Each structure stands twice: as C-alpha cells, then as structure tokens.
C-alpha cells in the first residue's frame, strides 16, 4: 500500500476510534460505530466470522495492514515512533525476534479467555489497552474542553454544547493506563512497534499469517539513499 494512503487511512481510523471512546452523546457511534467492529480480537470473541475472514484475507494479501492502519494501539506506536525518528539521526536497529515471549503471551491470552479470566485477557488485548488509555487519560481532557465550550456558548445564548460532570478514574485502572502509555512511548520511541512484535497476541497471529502474504516488502540495494 502506498505510504501516503496508509497514513491517511491510519489517521482516520485512529481519530474515529478515539472519538468512539470519548463520545458521551452517542451521536458519533451512529456514524463510526462500524470501526469498532473491525477490531480483530473483539471480532473473534463476538464470532463475527465475516470481519475475521476479511482481516485474515487482508493480511494474506497485504501483510500486517491491520496493525499499521486499523488497530489504534498500533497507530499510536507509529506516532510515538515518529517522534523518535525526529529526535535521533539513526534509524531503528535490528532486534532478534523474541518468539518465546510472543508465544507465551499468546498462550496466556488463550488460557485467560478459556478460563474466564477476562481482566487478565483485557490487560493483554491491544484494543482494551487503547481503551484504557483513551478512557482514563484522554476522556477527562476531552470533557473539560467540552465544558469550556459549553460555558462560552452559554455566554452568547447558544445551547450547542452542554456541561457534563468530569471525573477521573482512580486506582489500578488509572495506574495500568499510565504504565501502558509510558511503556509504549519508550519502546516505540527507541525502536518502533516493539510491543506489536513481541507482546501483542494479535500481532503474533497476524505476523505468522503475513509470512504467506502476497505482497511483501523488498529492499533494493541499488536504490538505497543516504
């Protein structure tokens, strides 16, 4: 896929899914709710075979396009990685694949789902991880911004916005969200989507399928630029 097209699609999915987590009116869900149904693990758990088949087919044809376009956590890491590239002259360094860790995390997710340990499964699942980040860290800022607009609208006799209560979640959920975003930033800043390639169970499954993809990246040494 063309890099510019991929970035545009990734931006649309990232903004759309983020707004789904921040929306408190329900209006955005009416227009963009379909984006949530295209998340791989939720589709598997919901037995949405049509979506699963589509995502698998895309992977077999174009590689891990899901991780770089549709998954919000993958796109978030690309954003962090962009800052990393700007901050340092050197490109990403090669890291040996940690297959054992990947398969352990995948097995842990499967066991957690089968045993009914939903909290553990949610801790590992990428879509759930992004949801915690959006709900715990971004939602309060979004609501405060809404309330500022509501106050301004009221001052000019407009009711386009209305104030809502803002509350921050505390306890373990907030701590997990903070630790997750910090860890993702550090890993992506240094070496790109490390989480996707070593920890994420969805990345492990799609990475295996992408070995047989029709389109694969090819490095032409004669065209390399310094």
Label each residue range with its predicted role:
Residues 1-223:
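Non-ligating segments of multi-cofactor redox enzymes
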């Amino acid at each position: 896929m063309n890099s510019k097209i991929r970035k545009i699609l990734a931006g649309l999915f990232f903004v759309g899914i983020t707004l789904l987590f921040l929306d408190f009116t329900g209006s955005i869900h009416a227009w963009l709710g379909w984006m949530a149904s295209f998340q791989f693990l939720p589709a598997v758990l919901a037995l949405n075979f049509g979506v699963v088949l589509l995502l698998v087919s895309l992977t077999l044809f174009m590689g891990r396009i899901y991780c770089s376009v549709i998954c919000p956590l993958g796109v978030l890491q690309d954003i962090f990685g962009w800052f990393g590239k700007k901050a340092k002259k050197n490109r990403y360094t090669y890291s040996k694949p940690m297959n054992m860790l990947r398969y352990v995390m995948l097995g842990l997710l499967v066991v957690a789902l089968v045993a009914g340990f939903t909290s553990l499964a949610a801790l590992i699942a990428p879509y759930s991880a992004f949801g915690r980040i959006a709900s715990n860290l971004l939602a309060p800022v979004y609501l405060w911004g809404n309330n500022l607009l509501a106050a301004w609208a009221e001052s000019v006799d407009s009711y386009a916005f209305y104030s809502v209560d803002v509350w921050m979640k505390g306890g373990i959920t907030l701590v997990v969200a903070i630790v997750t975003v910090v860890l993702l930033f550090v890993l992506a800043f240094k070496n790109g989507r490390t989480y996707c390639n070593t920890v994420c169970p969805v990345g492990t499954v799609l990475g295996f399928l992408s070995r047989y993809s029709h389109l694969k990246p090819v490095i032409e040494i004669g065209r390399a630029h310094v």
